[in-house]
Amino acid sequence: MIFPIFFTFFLLLSSSHASVQDFCVADYKAPDGPAGYSCKKPAKVTINDFVYSGLGIAGNTTNIIKAAVTPAFAAQFPGVNGLGISLARLDLGPGGVIPFHTHPGASEVLLVVQGTIIAGFVASDNTPYLKTLKKGDIMVFPQGLLHFQVNGGGTPALAFPSFSSPSPGLQILDFALFKNDLPTELIAQTTFLDAAQIKKLKGVLGGTN
């Protein structure tokens, strides 16, 4: 009898801030912190804080990766602050690609609604998992693992990724390596890539040295 009572008490103590209150709409006038935005005063909350219309507009895919991500994270959608969820729109033009990247703060579920997308991730033991996804398919990407999406057809593809955090974070591997001022010689030593290729990639992505 004691254990169930203790367990219930523990669950109550470990409840999130959002479960103590009905919601915690982001207050953009206050600074953002590791735990998210401060809560807007309830008297200033409106229905518009819980509605976001930006995902109905196609992203601009006329760029080097032929892709666009339109986020509805806490920074854009105040109503998701503190709720442990968020959403985005992914547009992939023909030949479009989202390079290897990670979300340090969230797992991801990808729903394909148009076209064909080749998606995959690499586990911590370096085992790759990949699948060609079509309309109606969903795929999960565990938190923190490197993953990618590639347009697998000759027509535009559209998907909606959702996340287990209002601020999932993002680090793109190619940008981390080549869109910076790390010395080419150091990158060559740590990646076993040819210096000429590294300089070429730095030139394409905006890196120096």
From Swiss-Prot:
Domain Cupin type-1 stretches: 53-199
SS bonds (residue pairs): C24-C39
Binding annotation for Mn(2+): H101, H103, E108, H147
Residues with attached carbohydrate: N60
Gene3D superfamilies: Jelly Rolls (2.60.120.10)
GO biological process annotation, one example: auxin-activated signaling pathway
Complexes and interactors: Interacts with ABP20.
The protein's name: Auxin-binding protein ABP19a
Species name: Prunus persica
